[in-house]
C-alpha cells in the first residue's frame, strides 16, 4: 500500500505544500524536479485518486472492511548535510541511503559519506525511518533527509465507527 506520513506542524519547517490545504492532506507523487511536468507522474496520480475513490465506495457499500491495524510514519525532525565552518556541504548522502526512503535504520548505520571516505552514522538507539533522502527541492531548506518514527494504529470498532462517520459513510 501507500505509506502514510504524518507531518504535524513543525515550527522549524515552513513553506511546504501541506500548509496550503485546509484539510492538511496531501498526496505526493515523486520525486519530481521543480517546474517539471511529467505526464507519466500525472497519470500515476490519477490512478491513485481513482483507486482511493473506488476504495471509499467499496467501504461505503460494505464490499471491503478496514484492516485491523494501520502503519504510519510520524515526522520527528529533519537533518541537514554535514557542513564545514564556511557552511559548505562536506559530505553527501551515503550510497546505502539512496532510494531507500521508508526503510528503517539502526544505530551505527551510515547516513553520509565525505570525500575522504569517512562515514557519518546514525547515532540514536531507536530505529528511525528516513524520508525525502537527498531531495533537491529541500536542499535550499537545509534538509538532507527527514526522520520519522513508525507507529501502528489498532483499528478497534470505536475507531472504525469514528472513521466511517468522518467519511459520512
What is the role of each PLM region?
Residues 1-169:
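Structured catalytic-domain cores with a bias toward divalent-metal coordination
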Amino acid at each position: 500500500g501507500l505509506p502514510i506520513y504524518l507531518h504535524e506542524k513543525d515550527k522549524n519547517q515552513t513553506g511546504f505544500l501541506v500548509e496550503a490545504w485546509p484539510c492538511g492532506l496531501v498526496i505526493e507523487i515523486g520525486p519530481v524536479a521543480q517546474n517539471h511536468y511529467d505526464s507519466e507522474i500525472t497519470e500515476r496520480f490519477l490512478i491513485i485518486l481513482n483507486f482511493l475513490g473506488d476504495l471509499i465506495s467499496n467501504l461505503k457499500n460494505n464490499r471491503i472492511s478496514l484492516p485491523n491495524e494501520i502503519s504510519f510514519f510520524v515526522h520527528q525532525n529533519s537533518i541537514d548535510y554535514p557542513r564545514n565552518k564556511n557552511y559548505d556541504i562536506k559530505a553527501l548522502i551515503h550510497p546505502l541511503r539512496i532510494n531507500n526512503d521508508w526503510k528503517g535504520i539502526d544505530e551505527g548505520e551510515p547516513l553520509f559519506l565525505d570525500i575522504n571516505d569517512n562515514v557519518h552514522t546514525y547515532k540514536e538507539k531507536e530505529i528511525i525511518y528516513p524520508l525525502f533522502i537527498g531531495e533537491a527541492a529541500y536542499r535550499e531548506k537545509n534538509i538532507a533527509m527527514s526522520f520519522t518514527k513508525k507507529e501502528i494504529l489498532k483499528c478497534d470498532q470505536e475507531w472504525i465507527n469514528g472513521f466511517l462517520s468522518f467519511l459520512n459513510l
